[in-house]
Design a protein with these regions (language model features):
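Bacterial N-terminal signal peptides that target proteins for export
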Residues: 1-9
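Extracellular or exported targeting regions of proteins
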Residues: 23-186
Length: 186
């Protein structure tokens, strides 16, 4: 009985997720350079949905961000950020939280560097931001995962005079897709 209930809940949850629109921030690998010393430099881009913005917040703790988890072999000093972003690397990657509890549960391997870029200037809805890079000593391809915190504008309540739109923080998690061009990297 409990197995049937559990399977039913899992199926309904999966259907609900599949039915929801798949529009949200994406972090993608745009280029990989194989360097003369055998290291690999990864270039990332962040793509925002039309309904999302990135806000610096009142402090780093409240600012929107993107974290790429488990970047094995990170070479110190190699990560670069575009203007309006600040880089950090922590053993436990920054993850969106609410009242101290994680909103998403990425696989975060202990003692493995994570790449976190925190926004320091507002980013408009629908933007694509390029210029995130990091170099690794590892030449093998490893599946990646990312999480992000974004700001979404909730619509005003219809019929309520004077009701304005309200910003809402949202958490995202996704697989870092390996682009097809990586098959050619040797």
């Amino acid at each position: 009985m409990l197995k049937t209930l559990g399977a039913s809940l899992l199926l309904v949850s999966g259907l609900a997720i599949a039915a929801a629109p798949a529009v949200a921030l994406q972090t993608v690998v745009t280029q990989v350079d194989k360097n003369a010393n055998g290291s690999m430099t990864y270039h990332f881009a962040v793509k925002l949905d039309q309904g999302e913005t990135l806000s610096p917040g009142e402090s780093k703790a409240t600012a929107d961000f993107v974290t790429v988890y488990n970047f094995y072999g990170l070479i110190d000093g190699s990560p670069k950020s575009p203007g309006g972003w600040e880089f950090s690397s922590e053993e436990f990657g920054r993850t969106p939280t609410l009242n101290g509890y994680p909103l998403v549960l990425p696989l975060d391997v202990p003692n493995t560097p994570n790449l976190t870029w925190t926004v320091t200037k507002p980013v408009a809805a629908g933007a694509q931001i390029d210029g995130f890079t990091a170099t690794t000593r590892v030449s093998a391809m490893v599946p990646g995962e990312y999480a992000a915190q974004v700001t979404r504008q909730l619509p005003a309540i219809q019929g309520a005079q004077g009701a304005a739109t309200k910003p809402s923080k949202q958490a995202l998690i996704g697989a870092l897709p390996t682009p097809s061009f990586l098959a050619d990297v040797k």
